[in-house]
């Protein structure tokens, strides 16, 4: 039965691992952005659980949905999913996830910042778009937004277009699809937000430190 139920990742996803980088934050610090492994899912889930009862800025619904997605990934019940981490020193300060619908379309899932006010969310959102377009070969990025903050920043300032609604609906609850093409990425997003491209390679000591991250002690809201 497991062979029937298991969501097996496409070979191209396994070959294209996100290259770690350092990205500067508003407070002058730098975070390591790297791809998570399934073995790290239980620890990431502990961080997400801190927000499931936070009734502010839609953290609760985002946390519950993100928890379900990462748990599904851990248990091989979501296909072609990837999870990126933002780590400041040795502390987990944010996560983003997405999945490939096919080799042409990437589906944005969720963005969670565990440290507010330093630009973690947009930096990580940029990183998951970067992975889809530059490493996995996507032609379009399909996003939707549950929070006003996400809609205001990535859904407005980053100038995505919209698919016809309700004729076309995002897999997250049948909501509106905000999409960015490969051309939009190269000619606008990547240029305007080039600061999020960061520095590569990550120094070995910082990368090693990021491998054993600590989760936040409490929700930062």
Model-derived segments and spans:
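Conserved beta-strand-loop-alpha-helix junction that forms the acyl-donor binding cleft
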Residues: 141-156
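Conserved catalytic-core motifs of GNAT/GCN5-like acyltransferases
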Residues: 144-145, 160-181
């Amino acid at each position: 039965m497991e062979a029937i139920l298991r969501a097996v990742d496409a070979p191209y996803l396994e070959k294209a691992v996100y290259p770690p980088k350092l990205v500067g934050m508003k407070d002058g610090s730098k975070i390591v952005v790297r791809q998570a492994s399934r073995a790290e899912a239980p620890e990431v889930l502990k961080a997400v659980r801190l927000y499931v009862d936070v009734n502010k800025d839609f953290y609760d619904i985002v946390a519950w949905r993100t928890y379900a997605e990462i748990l599904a990934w851990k248990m091989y019940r979501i296909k072609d999913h990837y999870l990126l981490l933002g780590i400041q020193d040795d502390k987990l300060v944010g996560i983003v996830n997405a999945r490939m619908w096919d080799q042409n379309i990437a589906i944005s899932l969720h963005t969670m910042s565990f440290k507010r006010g330093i630009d973690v969310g947009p930096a990580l959102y940029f990183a998951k778009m970067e992975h889809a377009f530059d490493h996995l070969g996507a032609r379009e990025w399909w996003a939707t937004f549950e929070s006003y903050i996400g809609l205001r920043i990535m859904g407005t300032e980053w100038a995505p277009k919209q698919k016809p609604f309700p004729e076309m609906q995002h897999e997250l609850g049948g909501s509106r699809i905000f999409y960015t093409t490969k051309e939009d990425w190269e000619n606008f997003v990547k240029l305007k937000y080039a600061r999020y491209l960061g520095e590569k390679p990550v120094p070995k000591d910082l990368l090693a430190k990021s491998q054993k991250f600590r989760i936040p002690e409490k929700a930062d809201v």
